[in-house]
Structures are given as structure tokens and as C-alpha cells.
């Protein structure tokens, strides 16, 4: 219904107050040409142009627009696509029909998708906690590092890998969890100098707008790109619909697993959450590959790094015929945490590889 009537609060950064501002001007739908960022009350130089870009493409016949075509996504040898499923104080402890709030927050699932340059296959591993608590969170968090290190070592890509994610939330969550288990990360000292790349920031900074997407949520962008035939993967209509639903279902699974004395990864509902998580990871990969192929061929990464170091300019200052990279945070975790890890005694042996339960084994598709 909201899409049918052009509900204004569907639009990026448009809340009730912004809708009221539009209604006061006789504007009842975002499809109205008079509906602009200014009409909604947005006049700042950062958000207003993005809102107008979204509204413009959604009132046009174009499928995708780039605010700047001179962008380059890192072409690392190993491209990781990481997605955390978390449970927070909204649904951590379910004792009755209604969730009981707590102050705890845990990662209960980590999806690791990756592709290797020159190899067509899509790879995915899912790490799922046996139950939702700090002990199991730590186990899968450390296992994530074991698995990723094994992958980069196998492909000789210690200095040539990028970790893609969607929005700052993933990186912030990683940083906070790393702080929580700092002592245990000492075994990885010197091995974790990964580049993190925020795809949502790429879309908002450029901006890249897609007809059918009114926000920059992964589901909005990926679903719109799927409808246009830009990507081939989408979430199942009868599956886990969103992250909130995944949290609620995971909380129920954790309680059931404790009662039965089994891992919640064995429960059918968790298998659906794993499928949902893989789609999150895979659509990021397909988005990266579509944009990379849709834009001009990129120069080598060495050439790009020289350009970036030489110019030392912000994106708006880069001339139109010069390639550039969207700035990304290149430390694996917050600098102060990184320093703390590197000061810990370095293990004399490589970190151990944690064996995955049968329900969490790796999937690979060579057809993609």
C-alpha cells in the first residue's frame, strides 16, 4: 500500500516531520514532481542532493544512475563478503509470548562469502553459535579469523584481500567484538591487516541510485537491481524476511536448543536463517561485479594507489577524467585495538583451524 500511494516516509531520510512539511505544501506522494528534498525540509549540502537523486530516478525510466562514473572498487585477489547476524536487547531472552529486554548483544551467526580473482566459483561458509551466549559468540568470532586466514593463505593473498560489507554497522560491530575478546586475538597478531570496504558508503557517496530503491538498505538496493536483471540472486519470498525476524527466530531456536541439549544449527528454522545470510553475502558480490563491469575498465591497483597518494584530494576535487577510489577505512579494527593486539605476544604457530559442524559446511557454486 505504501508503495502504491507513494508514501513519503519510504524515502531516504524522510520521517513524519518531513512528510508533514510536504503535506503543508499540498504534496501527498513522493511521485509528485514538487516533492523534493527542499520541500521535505532538507536543505543541507550532504543529504539533500542524495534525496533528490533518489526521487529523480524513481520518477524516470532510467534503471541506474551514477553520480560519478569515475569510481573504482578494489580488485583484490580475494574478495570477502561478510555479514553478521546479531541478537540484541530487543529479543535476547524470550520467556513468554513477548520478548523480555536485556542489555546484552551477541553475534550468533557469521556468513563468509568470497570469490578469488580468475576463478568463477562462489564460496560460502556459515559459522553458527550452538546457543546464544558469550562463549559461543567468541568461538565463532575466532573461527571467522581462522577461516579467513586459511582462505588468504591458500590463495597467497595476505596482502591482496578486501573485506566487503554493507553499512558501518558491520565494521563497528567487528570492532566492539574484537575489544571484547582482545586477549584471544593475540594469536592473530600481525596477520589481520585487512582492508574493509563499505559498499553502502560507495552508494551514498557517489551516489549510485537504482529505480525502485528509495533507501540505501541492502534489501532495497539488491531487490531493485534483481528486478532490473542486474543481479541473479534475491531473498526467497517465503524465507526469513529481514534481520529482525532472524533475531526473533534465532532467540526461539536458542531456547529450544538448550532444552534439547543440541546445537541450534541443527534446527530447521536456523537452516532458513543460514539461507537468508548467504543471500545477504551473495547479493553484495553480485552488486560489486555488476558495478565493476558496468563502469569503465579500471587501471591496475598499483596505478590507482599512486594516483590516490599523489593527489591527496577528496572525491569532489578529483577531475572528471581521472579514476579514484572511494575512501575506506583500511585497518582491520580500531587503531587503538590494533595496537593492543600487535603488542600481545605473537604465537609461534599459525592459528588453529576450527572444524565446522556438518550443518555449517562450506558451499561452492562453480556456475556463477
Q: Where are the language model's segments positioned?
A:
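Conserved DEDDh/DEDDy metal-dependent 3′-5′ exonuclease domain
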Residues: 124-248
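Acidic, low-complexity intrinsically disordered tails
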Residues: 304-348
Amino acid at each position: 500500500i505504501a508503495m502504491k500511494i507513494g508514501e513519503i516516509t519510504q524515502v531516504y531520510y524522510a520521517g513524519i516531520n518531513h512528510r508533514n512539511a510536504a503535506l503543508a505544501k499540498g504534496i501527498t506522494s513522493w511521485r509528485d514532481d514538487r516533492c523534493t528534498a527542499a520541500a521535505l525540509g532538507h536543505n543541507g549540502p550532504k543529504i539533500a542532493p542524495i534525496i533528490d537523486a533518489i526521487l529523480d530516478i524513481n520518477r524516470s525510466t532510467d534503471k541506474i544512475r551514477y553520480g560519478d562514473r569515475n569510481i573504482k572498487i578494489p580488485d583484490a585477489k580475494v574478495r570477502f563478503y561478510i555479514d553478521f547476524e546479531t541478537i540484541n536487547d530487543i529479543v535476547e531472552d524470550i520467556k513468554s509470548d513477548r520478548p523480555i529486554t536485556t542489555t546484552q548483544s551477541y553475534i550468533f551467526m557469521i556468513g563468509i562469502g568470497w570469490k578469488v580473482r580468475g576463478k568463477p566459483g562462489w564460496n560460502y561458509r556459515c559459522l553458527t553459535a550452538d546457543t546464544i551466549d558469550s562463549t559461543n559468540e567468541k568461538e565463532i568470532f575466532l573461527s571467522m579469523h581462522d577461516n579467513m586466514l586459511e582462505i588468504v593463505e591458500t590463495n597467497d593473498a595476505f596482502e591482496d584481500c578486501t573485506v566487503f560489507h554493507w553499512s558501518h554497522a558491520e565494521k563497528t560491530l567487528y570492532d566492539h567484538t574484537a575489544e571484547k575478546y582482545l586477549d584471544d586475538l593475540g594469536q592473530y597478531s600481525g596477520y589481520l591487516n585487512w582492508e574493509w570496504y563499505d559498499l553502502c558508503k560507495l552508494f551514498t557517496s557517489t551516489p549510485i541510485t537504482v529505480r525502485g530503491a528509495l533507501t540505501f538498505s541492502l534489501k532495497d538496493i539488491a531487490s531493485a537491481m534483481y528486478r532490473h536483471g542486474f543481479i541473479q540472486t534475491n531473498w526467497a519470498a517465503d524465507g526469513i524476511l529481514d534481520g529482525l525476524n532472524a533475531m526473533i527466530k534465532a532467540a526461539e531456536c536458542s531456547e529450544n536448543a538448550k532444552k534439547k541439549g543440541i546445537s541450534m544449527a541443527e534446527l530447521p528454522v536456523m537452516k532458513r536463517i543460514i539461507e537468508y545470510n548467504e543471500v545477504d553475502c551473495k547479493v553484495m558480490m553480485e552488486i560489486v561485479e555488476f558495478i565493476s563491469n558496468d563502469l569503465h575498465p579500471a587501471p591496475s591497483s598499483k596505478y590507482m594507489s599512486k594516483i590516490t597518494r599523489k593527489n591527496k584530494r577528496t572525491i569532489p576535487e578529483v577531475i572528471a577524467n581521472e579514476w579514484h577510489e572511494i575512501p575506506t577505512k583500511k585497518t582491520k579494527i580500531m587503531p587503538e585495538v590494533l595496537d593492543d593486539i600487535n603488542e600481545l605476544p605473537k604465537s609461534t604457530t599459525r592459528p588453529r583451524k576450527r572444524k565446522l559442524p556438518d550443518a555449517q559446511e562450506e558451499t561452492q557454486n562453480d556456475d556463477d
